[in-house]
Structures are given as C-alpha cells and as structure tokens.
C-alpha cells in the first residue's frame, strides 16, 4: 500500500466521546508503524431549532434548542496491511459516526 493515504472523518454530538475515539485510532495506527496526521478539529456544526412553547397561541413565546455536531479528521499516511486489519477490528463507541476514504 505504498503511496496511499487513508482519511478518516469522525462525527459525534459529544466532544469527549469523539476525542477519546480519535485518541484510540491514533494509538492503534502508531502501534502498527504507519504515520498519522491529526486529529484535526474541524468546525463544529450548530443547528438551532425554534419551537413555539404553547400548542395553540402565544406565538411570541418561543423556545430555542441547539444541536452541535463535532467533527475530527485523521490522515493515515502509508498504511500497512496490519494497520488496515487493526482498524477493522477496532471497537468504538456507538455515538461516533465514521467515514473512511482510501
């Protein structure tokens, strides 16, 4: 796999969970002998939802809810077959979305 690069994007609502997952990925990759760039924190996506508090009237009384999506980027340079195998067996928490591009 010479000259290849694996790009991993992580998304989660909780920043502690995503940081812990990124740390585990970096530790696993460095143990197998590949080079790692990252984790790079990407901009946090913030969605704000405005909801009327009353079910019928009082339109002036509203409540705001927000949902933040934290993102991290990890690049693995010159991965070995052992690196790919260990990444496939890595067990990460349920709240983390992982996108892998070769």
Swiss-Prot record:
GO terms for biological process: translation. One of its GO terms (cellular component) is ribosome. GO terms for molecular function: structural constituent of ribosome; tRNA binding. Keywords: Ribonucleoprotein, Ribosomal protein. The keyword Cell division does not apply. The keyword Ribonucleoprotein applies. Pfam families: Ribosomal_S10 (PF00338). Involved in the binding of tRNA to the ribosomes. Part of the 30S ribosomal subunit. HAMAP family: Ribosomal_uS10. Belongs to the universal ribosomal protein uS10 family. NCBIfam families: PRK00596.1 (NF001861), rpsJ_bact (TIGR01049). This is Small ribosomal subunit protein uS10. It comes from Thermobifida fusca (strain YX).
């Amino acid at each position: 796999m010479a000259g290849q690069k694996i790009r991993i994007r992580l998304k989660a609502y909780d920043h502690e969970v995503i940081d812990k997952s990124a740390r585990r990925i970096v530790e696993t990759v460095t143990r197998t002998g590949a080079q790692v760039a990252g984790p790079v924190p990407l901009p946090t996506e913030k969605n704000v939802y405005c909801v009327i508090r009353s079910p019928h009237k009082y339109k002036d009384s509203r409540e705001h809810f927000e949902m933040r999506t934290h993102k991290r980027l990890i690049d693995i340079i010159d991965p070995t077959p052992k690196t790919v195998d260990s990444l496939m067996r890595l067990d990460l928490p349920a709240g983390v979305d992982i996108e892998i591009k070769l």
